[in-house]
């Protein structure tokens, strides 16, 4: 992941 602001679960 590059530049992840909000991880999607």
UniProtKB/Swiss-Prot annotation:
It comes from the Eukaryota. It is found in: Secreted. The modification Phenylalanine amide is found at residue 9. GO terms for cellular component: extracellular region. Keywords: Amidation, Neuropeptide, Secreted. Limited to neuronal cell bodies, neuronal processes and sinus gland. May act as a neurotransmitter, neuromodulator or neurohormone. Belongs to the NPY family. This is Peptide tyrosine phenylalanine 2. It comes from Penaeus monodon (Giant tiger prawn).
């Amino acid at each position: 992941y590059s530049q992840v602001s909000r991880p999607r679960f």
